[in-house]
Amino acid sequence: MALKELLGSDAPLEKVCSALLEYESKRKSSENIDSESKKTNLLEDEQDDIEPVWLQLATLKFIGNNRKLIPYKIAIKNPVIPSSSEACLIVKDPQRVYKDLVNEAGLSKVVTRVIGLSKLKAKWNSYEQKRQLRDQFDIFLADDRVIPMLPRILGKTFYQKSKVPVPVKISKGTAEQLKREVVSAYGATYFNSAPCSSFMIKCGHVSNTSTELAENVESILQFVSKHIVPDGAKGIASIHLKTSQSIAIPLWNNPNLKELIASSRKVVTKETASSKRKSDEESLPSQKKQKKVEVAKESKDSKQQNVSDKKQVTVKEVPKKLSVKNAAKTTNRDEDSKGKKAKASPKVSQSSLKANGTTAIKKVKAGKNKVKH
């Protein structure tokens, strides 16, 4: 599929690629004016040759992350991974079997190290050791059967620096399958999915020609519009090309961008309004239930309060009744004591009368005796 069929317009793809490469060549020449620095800094020249070119895309909608730390593999015509780069292969135990397969397939210059899971856990345990392993190799390949276990073992040091291991299928255990998978991995570019509306994919190097870059860009755009961007090519807002040292050169801008943004906002508002209605409708029965529960609670509380009030009344009345009874008892006791005293008083008066009578009789007798004498 041509770029015109994909985007619906004649995008000057090769012109943009050649303009970017020309800009980079001028930048390098301006930075390396001194001839002596060109002779001495050979490493810098090599690094400039492998300066990556990035395809930057902006989308109308957010891209979800459904890959679970597995990168998208995008086949391209011109490899972005240099053939001189070294790879590390992470495999299941025992690792000796896969080392023999690498030698048998003639990949010992490409896959320079094979590591089993048990050795990876034991030897590269600390953060510093994992960082050294990450910086030692250009690309990491991993048996697709161990991919789910690697995030926990390798940690953030790998996944934050875009050194996500590329899955390869080597379950058959043959040299032919291993060679085919490694060649396919080197002939592709990768995209680590994340929730975003703007992202970049490596599409080549400054050492490539403008035609090679244009071919890679077309392959990437076809894959992205089919597998990554929602709504396909219609969901792309803009396309740019850039390097790490250059500005973003526009390749294509959606001519209907304003209308699409306005329509998408309307759709969003409609969706939010419908979701609010649904939430309100769903909340109505819950509100009714809540009201019923509150009414039931209130009736329960009122009943409990009435019961407690009754208990308090009975508790208050019981002492009164008890006090009345006690008062009655005390009054009865007083009356009994008074009756006893009343009964006892006549006895005392009779005895006193007898005593008085005897004394009076004695006095009378004494008076008679005096008269006789």
Swiss-Prot record:
Its main localization is nucleus
Segments of this protein annotated with the region Disordered: 265-373
For this protein, the record's PANTHER family field holds: RIBOSOMAL PROTEIN L7AE FAMILY MEMBER
Please report the name of this protein according to its UniProt entry: Putative ribosome biogenesis protein C8F11.04
Q: Where is the composition biased (Basic and acidic residues)?
A: 292-320
Entries under Pfam families matching the protein: Ribosomal_L1
Bias category Polar residues: which stretches? 347-359
Similarity comment:
Belongs to the universal ribosomal protein uL1 family. Highly divergent.
Which residue stretches does the UniProt record annotate as biased composition, category Basic residues? Answer: 362-373
Q: What does this protein do?
A: Involved in rRNA-processing and ribosome biosynthesis.
Q: How does it assemble?
A: Component of the 90S pre-ribosomes.
Q: Which CDD domains match?
A: Ribosomal_L1
Query: Which compartments does it reside in?
Result: Nucleus, Nucleolus
Name the domain of life this protein comes from: Eukaryota
| UniProt keyword terms in alphabetical order | Nucleus, Ribosome biogenesis, rRNA processing
Q: What is a GO molecular function of this protein?
A: RNA binding
Q: Name one GO cellular component term.
A: nucleolus
